[in-house]
Every structure is written in C-alpha cells, then in structure tokens.
Curated annotation (Swiss-Prot):
Organism: Acinetobacter baumannii (strain AB0057)
CDD domains: Ribosomal_L13
Protein family: Belongs to the universal ribosomal protein uL13 family.
GO molecular function: mRNA binding; structural constituent of ribosome
Keywords: Ribonucleoprotein, Ribosomal protein
Subunit structure: Part of the 50S ribosomal subunit.
Biological processes per GO annotation: negative regulation of translation; translation
One Pfam short name: Ribosomal_L13
Ribosomal protein as UniProt keyword: yes
Any GO CC annotation of this UniProt entry: cytosolic large ribosomal subunit
The keyword Zinc-finger appears for this protein: no
Stated name of the protein: Large ribosomal subunit protein uL13
Length: 142
C-alpha cells in the first residue's frame, strides 16, 4: 500500500469560527495553529497547505494566566536608531486585540512561503461580528 500525498487541487478547506471569550491564549493558539496547518486531517502532507480557515471572534476577551497580563512584553522596532518600543499584554489587548492572536499563532507555524499562506487563513476580530457569513462557518468548540 502506498502512502497518499495530498495535492493542492484535491484539498478541501473548511471554515470554522472560534469564540475566544474566557479562553487561555496559549491553549487556544496551539489548537488554531494545528488546524491551520492541517495536522488534524488524515490527508495531512507537510509540503501542501491542507489546513482550514479559522475565524476568531471576541479576541479582546481572551485571557492569560498568572501575572502575564502585566509581565508579558511585546516588542516592535520603528527601524530608526533607538526605536525599540515595548508594550505589555494588557495595553495591547486594549489597543490591538487582533495582533495578540497573530503573534501567538505565527510563531507556531512554519517559516517560509507555506507558513505565510497558512497565517493568511486566520481571520481575527475584536468583537462578535465577522463578515464571513457567506462561507457558512461551523462553530468549533476548543
């Protein structure tokens, strides 16, 4: 019996919606990364994008454990000398709640063209509304 290798034209990408209300950031991000990569499918192939589309709603209501809300630092650089900026989890949730999920999940995906295609399949929204009703996403309880 031969090992089956998925071909890009044969892969079916489903749409799922995940509610982040009251969920822990890391545990939710690992499951999202696994589904974006397609490792939950029997047709998983490392060099083919077999993952699903994930819509994350209520990103502003995600939680972290311990003192990470104040202690966890996020860094960015303005590309000017001395332009290193830092913020903590609490401030970033108030300002850009979508960026928290993008940073958490992006670090769990492969680097390179395939990983960049996978991260584009994740749509994150701060509130409970999303514009993807036409795709008829299924509710995914994590």
């Amino acid at each position: 019996m031969k090992t089956l290798s998925a071909k890009p034209a044969e892969v079916q990408h489903d749409w799922f919606v995940v509610d982040a209300t009251g969920k822990t950031l890391g545990r939710l991000a690992t499951e999202i990364a696994r589904r974006l990569r397609g490792k939950h499918k029997t047709s998983y192939t490392p060099h083919v994008d077999t993952g699903d589309y994930i819509i994350v709603i209520n990103a502003e209501q995600v939680q972290v454990t311990g003192n990470k809300a104040l202690d966890k630092k996020y860094y960015r650089h303005t590309e000017f000398p001395g332009g290193l900026k830092e913020t903590n989890f609490e401030k970033l949730v108030a300002h850009k709640p979508e960026e928290i999920f993008e940073r958490a999940v992006k670090g769990m995906l492969p680097k390179g063209p395939l990983g960049y295609a996978m991260i584009k399949k994740m749509k994150v929204y701060a509130g409970s509304e999303h514009p993807h009703a036409a795709q008829q996403p299924q509710v995914l309880d994590i």
